[in-house]
A protein has these predicted regions:
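Nucleic acid-machinery interaction/catalytic patches
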Residues: 1-331
Length: 331
């Protein structure tokens, strides 16, 4: 049996609470994230983002004939990686997405599933790039756009030849393989998905395939009134997920906790970091923080650039912290 959680931290807490309720020693079930499960079924390795940027840069320079340096390409490359990932996670048709459609007849033939308003919007967008006397910026945009599909295809082929892939590519390949009727080498008789929320198209279709094979069960973390409020956009996923992937067992209702929120206005990032020090110091002075209280205490930053100032603001009394946040290669 395997349990699939949104992230590894959730899995660690699950193991902690499982050990507390177990009367006797037991072997822990396999704990995975949904990314781990996709990678396991694909047989591919998750490609390193930095190496992918260099690979993408080499292909881009060769296909476009551009003389951009890697530094100049970096921002553009990051955006392309994100776009390619979204294309595959949402199972979009990349060839059609990157089509350079300017003729209304061509739009009507290739995009007959669109409404008249959508066709008009697409035509309006592309027609703006074909006035008499194209500007250099328009020409550059069109030149880049025309190589995007070939860039996407060669980039994926290069990664596949190395036995690697980015998340969306791996997700898509696993789903398409299962939908063709191929049976992945599943080492688990039962897979329980816990606490997932906003699912991409590839994730939905993956869960549907496992559900069809009767090896998946689903449990959703929808306790908050705001999440279940039909007037709140967040509730869209609640009804959709519960209807498509119901739980096989009914769990007892969780006790709702009343949240207390205090808003403190501080204009600068450094000021926010200093106030974190003040708050943590006060909590440590009031009573020695137990290990359980420490586990339930989190500092959530709105900006990754605040990470270093906040780390420097941690009081000396707090000896151990767990940082789960990325930091940019350049600031």
């Amino acid at each position: 049996m395997a349990f699939v959680f949104p992230n590894r931290r959730t899995g660690l807490f699950f193991q902690k609470y499982l050990s507390e309720v177990a009367d006797t020693p037991l072997f822990s079930p396999t704990i995975l994230t949904i990314n781990d499960l996709f990678i396991q079924l694909s047989g591919k390795q998750s490609a390193d983002r930095i190496s992918m940027l260099f690979t993408l840069y080499d292909i881009y320079i060769r296909q476009s004939g551009s003389t951009e340096t890697f530094d100049e390409f970096l921002y553009w490359g990051e955006m392309l990686l994100n776009d390619f990932d979204d294309i595959d996670k949402y199972m979009a048709n990349a060839r059609m997405l990157f089509s350079n459609v300017t003729d209304l007849r061509e739009i009507e033939n290739d995009f007959d599933f669109l409404s008249d308003e959508q066709i008009a919007a697409i035509r309006s967008f592309w027609s703006s790039f074909y006035p008499r006397g194209d500007t250099p910026n328009q020409q550059q945009f069109l030149a880049v756009w025309q190589v995007l599909y070939d860039l996407y295809e060669e980039f994926r082929a290069t990664l596949a030849a190395e036995g690697k892939g980015y998340e969306g590519m791996i997700f898509r390949e696993v789903v398409e393989s299962m939908e063709r009727g191929e049976s992945p080498d599943l080492p688990y008789e039962q897979i329980v998905f816990v606490g997932l929320n906003a699912l991409s198209v590839s994730e939905e279709r993956f869960l549907a395939q496992l559900q069809k094979r009767e090896i998946a069960d689903f449990y959703w973390d929808y306790v908050s009134d705001k999440v279940t409020d039909p007037d709140n956009k967040a509730s869209y996923f609640v009804s959709r997920n519960r209807k498509s992937f119901p739980s096989s067992m009914k769990l007892p209702p969780e006790e709702k906790v009343k949240t207390e929120i205090e808003v403190i206005g501080i204009p600068s990032g450094i000021g926010q970091a200093k106030h974190v020090y003040t708050l943590l110091s006060d909590w440590c002075k009031e009573a020695e923080m137990s290990s359980e209280e420490a586990l339930r205490t989190a500092v959530i930053l709105p900006d990754e650039h605040l990470l270093i100032p906040v780390l420097n603001a941690i009081p000396e009394q707090i000896r151990r912290i767990n940082v789960t946040m990325g930091y940019p290669l350049r600031s």
